[in-house]
Design a protein with these regions (language model features):
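Bacterial N-terminal signal peptides that target proteins for export
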Residues: 1-8
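Bacterial N-terminal signal peptides
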Residues: 8-16
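N-terminal alpha-helical modules
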Residues: 20-132
Length: 132
């Protein structure tokens, strides 16, 4: 059963990697990421490099928007955002851990790294809505 869940998770991630362009714009992934993934040739190590570079960009984006939202929130809002962010981090880490099944090999590493990136970009996009 565990093997089946790993195969399903990896398969879904690889399918998602193929269909990134529309989602990229929606969640704010950089054009550099698209170019890098296009040039990766489907080689896992190259794809992981692309994901790693984009994750750094998205982590910085998330940290910036989080600070901006906190700076404009009242005390009650700051407390709610802090609690929500802590809960989100806990969920993200558990979810990524599921994708990084140790029995899944390099594909699971790719799936976990991609999941972390996508969740980070999605969270940044969610918080950016509070600035509008």
């Amino acid at each position: 059963m565990r093997k089946l869940s790993t195969v399903a998770a990896v398969g879904m991630t690889l399918l998602c990697l193929v269909k990134v362009s529309a989602q990229d714009e929606k969640i704010g992934l950089s054009r550099d990421y698209d170019v890098c993934m296009d040039k990766s040739g489907g080689v896992t190590a190259n794809m992981l490099d692309c994901i790693g570079a984009e994750t750094k960009r998205q982590d910085a984006r998330l940290n910036k928007i989080y600070k901006d939202v906190m700076a404009h929130a009242d005390e009650a809002g700051k407390k709610r955002l802090l609690e929500a962010q802590r809960a989100w981090i806990k969920f993200r880490d558990a979810d990524v851990d599921f994708y990084r099944d140790p029995n899944g090999g390099t594909a699971a590493t790719l799936a976990g790294s991609d999941r972390y990136l996508m969740m980070t970009a999605e969270r940044a996009a969610e918080l950016e809505k509070f600035k509008e």
